[in-house]
Amino acid sequence: MAEQLIQLEQIKAQKDLVISNILKYKIIAIFRNISNDEILCTAEALYNGGIRLMEVTFDQSGRFSEEYTAKQISLIASHFGDGLLVGAGTVLTERQVAIARDAGAKYIISPNTDEKVIKKTNECGMVSIPGALTPTEIQYAHACGADFVKLFPADNLGIGYIKAVLAP
């Protein structure tokens, strides 16, 4: 019992550290469809430019396998150690959450709000960042246990929409 409590406290401390780093660094660079040959030199260039948060996306088109994404997450995580936090993006399934965790991801970013994905992310001790568009979806994401919510898709909404959502 005491061992489990200590383990839970360690998981919470690790998650709190990831949250504080996301709040501190704010910018998450997104890696999508980058070859294994280019991923580390691209990550190093971003790191040298001050980026400390990187997201490797799962390819839902089937062009790149889940294992390919896991390999890239693992390459970045092992190369940079604690100097950089890598997460997985475009995560749609609980299986992808587990694959990302095993590869070294510290946070999960999804384009949607899926209660099962959020729950699995929290069970794995990772930070959950689902996507949501409406105030109802945003509230639902938080109710499911999301640590942050990504406004998605946001490209055509404008600052007025964001201000309106934040107003209440």
Task: Set out the residue ranges of the language-model regions.
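Conserved anion-binding
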Residues: 68, 83, 95, 101-168
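Conserved N-terminal beta1-alpha1 strand-loop-helix module at the mouth
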Residues: 2-86, 91-103, 123
